[in-house]
Amino acid sequence: MKDRFAVSMFGQKRLSREGGIEIVVKELCTRMARDGCQVTCYNRSGHHVSGAEYDNKIEYDGIRQKFVLTIERKGLAAVSSSFFAALYSAFGKYDVVHIHAEGPAFFSWLPKILGKRVVVTIHGIDWQREKWKSGFGSKFIRQGEKNAVKYADEIIVLSKGVQDYFKDTYGRETHFIPNGVNRPETREAGLITEKFGLTKDSYILFLGRLVPEKGIRYLVEAFKNVKTDKKLVGSMSIVGVALKQNN
């Protein structure tokens, strides 16, 4: 009897839902496990933001979780955890090693030289982001991008713009597979009204990370120039964030 198709995943911090990459990995892995694949996620060690009960959870919705050595210092957590995840993936019995994001892809050569098929998903051109525009981080991430081009058997991108970038910059073909969404469940907005005093169709919601590349300042400027009685709503004072970005 043939063993189940085995896949290793790394690049995420940990499951379940810490950020965009973690959500993608969770949704992908649970579906693969449901379809009969043996999926192992190599996560960062350390405290889980969702609560202590997740810290050493070995299995999550059919996904095997393993926690790798992580140096808890700024700039080293992602590098160290990605290195050890790549090392375990390289020596493990996996058919495919699936790496998420450009930084972790720096180590794509490691499973590749040991005969593994390597897939890299590019979630964005990370070295262009404001927080990585200078210093070691930017150089490391950009080299990760180049290593993905050189060593990955397949590259997945989430947007046509990134697909064009890889084609124009490296002449590399990629697979355009945008993120999907689960079918939403419609609920009455009673809690929103009760907690925030907001009613249906009375507000414009900003939902996203509060980082410069999201362009919140443009939203605020546009809102200031629109005649409306709607409220502009965010997870914190997005006006304050926008003002900070402009300074």
Where are the regions that the model predicts?
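N-terminal subdomain of nucleotide-sugar transferases
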Residues: 1-47, 92, 224-226
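Conserved donor-binding/catalytic core segment of Leloir-type glycosyltransferases
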Residues: 8, 156, 197-214, 220-225, ...
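Glycosyltransferase donor-sugar binding loop
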Residues: 45-47, 181, 207, 231-247
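An aromatic- and histidine-rich active-site surface loop
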Residues: 76-90, 94-127
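Membrane-proximal helix-turn-helix segments that form the acceptor-binding/catalytic region
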Residues: 87-90, 113, 137-155
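Nucleotide-sugar donor phosphate/pyrophosphate-binding loop at the beta->alpha transition
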Residues: 117, 127-147, 187
